Curated annotation (Swiss-Prot):
SUPFAM superfamilies: Translation proteins SH3-like domain. Keywords: Ribonucleoprotein, Ribosomal protein. The keyword Ribonucleoprotein applies. One of its GO terms (cellular component) is nucleolus. PANTHER family: 60S RIBOSOMAL PROTEIN L6 (PTHR10715), LARGE RIBOSOMAL SUBUNIT PROTEIN EL6X-RELATED (PTHR10715:SF10). It comes from the Eukaryota. This is Large ribosomal subunit protein eL6y. GO terms for molecular function: mRNA binding; structural constituent of ribosome. One of its GO terms (biological process) is translation.
Length: 233
């Protein structure tokens, strides 16, 4: 492809001598067609307003940038959505706990808390399971029901089960080397009274159904030859 030839720009008003043009200002006015532009715009030359200056930033950007790219933290747009309760779990349903300290125990479901966890109890007097929160992923709902209409559950929420943060005390040199047994944490008397009140109302309803007390006291386990997917709970 041949290279384009550059054409020299021709001055429309060549200099006769340095600083003196061939044509006067009035001649160039007509030669350049400025009169036509002025007539087209109502006898006034078109005016272009100057662009507004961009406001200078309050803080100057840094002169130097870090050698390694610093990752910018992404905004957290996650929102807490209430967990949907399984259709097989309704207030009063007897559940089987599958994991944790009380695995295999049968408990009575009382209500779902705002966090999505299930509020359950043994009752404590029958199988030793106190009022506690359980994730519904670790329970099996059975077809057995208990009437819990006489149980008052207004005071039980997620804050009720929250632990009070205790300040750790610095041990002295003597206490550090002494092998002392840790003191057992005592349960507040108020929580003990709440457990007794719930147990009393539940046991009254449980004793009205024959064999239900024995059923709740027995631990669930699989024996040889039993197929979990074929069991009807």
């Amino acid at each position: 492809m041949p290279a384009k030839q550059r054409t020299a720009k021709v001055n429309r008003n060549p200099d006769l001598i340095r600083g003196v043009g061939k044509y006067s200002r009035s001649q160039m006015y007509h030669k350049r067609g400025l009169w036509a532009i002025k007539a087209k715009n109502g006898g006034v030359f078109p005016r272009h307003d100057a662009k507004s200056k961009v406001d200078a930033p309050v803080e100057k950007p840094p002169k130097f940038y870090p050698a390694e790219d610093v990752k910018k933290p992404l905004p957290n747009r996650r929102t807490a959505k209430p967990a949907k309760l399984r259709a097989s779990i309704t207030p009063g349903t007897v559940l089987i706990i599958l994991a944790g300290r009380f695995k295999g125990k049968r408990v009575v479901f009382l209500k779902q808390l705002a966090s999505g966890l299930l509020l359950v109890t043994g009752p404590f007097k029958i199988n030793g399971v106190p009022l506690r929160r359980v994730n519904q992923a670790y329970v099996i709902g059975t077809s057995t029901k208990v009437d819990i209409s006489g149980v008052t559950l207004d005071k039980f929420d997620d804050k009720y089960f929250g632990k009070v943060a205790e300040k750790k005390k610095k041990k002295t040199e003597g206490e550090f080397f002494e092998a002392e047994k840790e003191e057992k944490k005592e349960i507040p008397q108020g929580k003990k009274d709440d457990q007794k009140a719930v147990d009393a109302a539940l046991i009254k309803a449980i004793e009205a159904v024959p064999e239900l007390k024995t059923y709740l006291g027995a631990r669930f386990s699989l024996k040889q030859g039993m197929k979990p997917h074929e069991l009807v709970f």
